[in-house]
A protein has these predicted regions:
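Conserved GHKL (Bergerat-fold) ATPase module
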Residues: 2, 6-236
């Protein structure tokens, strides 16, 4: 901290001393480090540094670190979305070599992940070009696909490591997961490992688990499995 002197309008007034934080550039931000160097507290501190007005902790994070066939580093956070979804606030930030470029990442980050927060840093992303150009760029396609894969891998890991905790978080993350399932074929192909289907009695099943549970006693006249669903647990 530094001690500063505040000028007074009155010539004979006693100068007032105030303390202010030193403002310095972080020469080694969290996303440039290896995941093994960071603790959960480090990730949380970085999130608060990025979004000081966000008071709820993120649900979990995804660390990006690849240098071939493209260069990409970054940290993405799954926020607790609740019912207030605002795509124009606290967006993902794009950097190039630790220099902030923009928080307009349409065409770089898949649409279904635009609700996430954090930082991506890559010198391989062309700047000042249209979204259609970005989507056609070979490096950007690979980066977008890699981000999608990392999110899917993270979901698979979370549900395997702590199924109970994952189920508790499902309502907060399902809008992202379900949007990804209908918009990204590669994500849909992986989703059978982590997408959950809640039943009216409060249980959660993956698609494979649900199929195994009902296939022998919920079939039509042709022997095909029938899945019953409701949009209103109480009214139907």
């Amino acid at each position: 901290r530094q001690m500063c002197i505040r000028d007074s309008a009155a010539e004979d007034a006693k100068p007032e001393e105030i303390e202010v934080d030193n403002i310095i550039n972080n020469t080694q931000p969290a996303w440039t480090k290896s995941p093994s160097e960071l603790t959960d507290e480090d990730y949380l501190a970085f999130y608060r540094e990025l979004y000081p007005m966000q008071f709820e902790e993120p649900l979990f994070h995804i660390h990006l670190n690849v240098d071939y066939p493209f260069n990409l580093t970054g940290i993405l956070f799954f926020p607790k979305l609740g019912n207030n979804i605002n795509l124009d606030k606290d967006r993902i930030q794009l950097y190039q070599n630790q220099v902030f470029v923009t928080d307009e990442v349409n065409g770089i980050v898949p649409d279904f992940l635009m609700l996430l927060r954090g930082v991506i840093d890559s010198p391989d992303i062309p700047l000042n070009v249209s979204r259609s150009y970005l989507q056609a760029d070979g490096a950007v396609k690979k980066i977008s696909a890699h981000i999608t894969k990392k999110v899917a891998d993270k979901m698979s890991s979370l549900i395997t490591q702590n199924r109970e905790d994952y189920e508790k978080k499902w309502n907060d993350i399902k809008v992202v997961i379900e949007y990804g399932m209908i918009s990204e074929d590669k994500f849909f192909e992986k989703s059978d490992k982590f997408a959950l289907y809640p039943t009216v009695d409060g249980k959660y099943f993956t698609w494979t688990e649900l199929s195994d549970t009902i296939k022998d006693h919920q079939t039509n006249k042709d022997g095909n499995m029938v899945v019953l669903y409701t949009t209103d647990d109480n009214g139907q």
